[in-house]
Amino acid sequence: MKNVAVLSGDGIGPEVMEIAISVLKKALGAKVSEFQFKEGFVGGIAIDKTGHPLPPETLKLCEESSAILFGSVGGPKWETLPPEKQPERGALLPLRKHFDLFANLRPAIIYPELKNASPVRSDIIGNGLDILILRELTGGIYFGQPKGREGSGQEEFAYDTMKYSRREIERIAKVAFQAARKRNNKVTSIDKANVLTTSVFWKEVVIELHKKEFSDVQLNHLYVDNAAMQLIVNPKQFDVVLCENMFGDILSDEASIITGSIGMLPSASLSESGFGLYEPSGGSAPDIAGKGVANPIAQVLSAALMLRYSFSMEEEANKIETAVRKTIASGKRTRDIAEVGSTIVGTKEIGQLIESFL
């Protein structure tokens, strides 16, 4: 039995998760009997019910599962809590660390029908865009020790530590090279080797691994500031973009914006064993929660990534992705991706349309 922990969370999470599970079951067909979907509380709703953003029973549910399908967490209601008790820091970050979800895959796709939704000129986008940002997720300056604040007055200071081991760099680089082999066979590694010692080491390790195991894959390097510019002026040069944690955090958000809607973008966070957490790239959007207008496509595509990476069900994953493309081509859109001539529909209608193409 394939167990999936379903953590809908807060805001629009429950309503888009409902659509994703329905699409998932339709795509699986008779194979749905091989799956068990078990729900757990996480984030703000978990705080309200248990006092903790990641209750022990939810963590146990995840440990007994093969994958986590995650919605979104957070909202104004919980913003005044201590940082470690807030939904994202108290739930999502501990889940990543607990399961060693070191590889974050963030596709940034612009479908031809949606190229006018991008803030980037249509002549730059051409007939669409397909970039995969590969971000190291459990190391670097976000987790490095020591960190803290000391002193007082004009002598007060704060510090963080940016640190990477050879093992951490090699394992994320391997995922990038392996992903590139299934795409357009090109990796762009991002660093700041003209300033940072960790970046010098990062670049050295990536080059060594490339020569030893992946010489068939095209490899090039960009400083992070240049990469941020190139994503805007010439995004089609990229296939797989390999980044350490902080650089990947920034560049993946930039890449998501050039697609025109963050409501379209899924993500996968994977461990070495293949265990994964799958979630939309956007937030909980409390301002539109419960109104039936949220775009469920990112959650649906996250479910497709789960089938691909945690269960090796490529055919079913492709079916969902094809159904999403056909839905977009039909001209019916949620309001975040609507343009002149398209028909604006709600969350449930988009879900029904996706299912009609399965």
UniProtKB/Swiss-Prot annotation:
Matches recorded under InterPro entries: IsoCit/isopropylmalate_DH_CS, IsoPropMal-DH-like_dom, Isopropylmalate_DH
Cofactor note: Binds 1 Mg(2+) or Mn(2+) ion per subunit.
Site (Important for catalysis) residue list: 142, 192
SS bond list: none
Chain's gene name: leuB
Listed EC numbers: 1.1.1.85
Associated pathway: Amino-acid biosynthesis; L-leucine biosynthesis; L-leucine from 3-methyl-2-oxobutanoate: step 3/4
Lineage, highest ranks first: Bacteria, Pseudomonadati, Spirochaetota, Spirochaetia, Leptospirales
Gene3D superfamilies to which the protein is assigned, alphabetical: Isopropylmalate Dehydrogenase
GO biological process: L-leucine biosynthetic process
Sorted UniProt keywords: Amino-acid biosynthesis, Branched-chain amino acid biosynthesis, Cytoplasm, Leucine biosynthesis, Magnesium, Manganese, Metal-binding, NAD, Oxidoreductase
Entry-linked Pfam families: Iso_dh
Protein name per its UniProtKB record: 3-isopropylmalate dehydrogenase
Subcellular location: Cytoplasm
GO molecular function per UniProt: 3-isopropylmalate dehydrogenase activity; magnesium ion binding; NAD binding
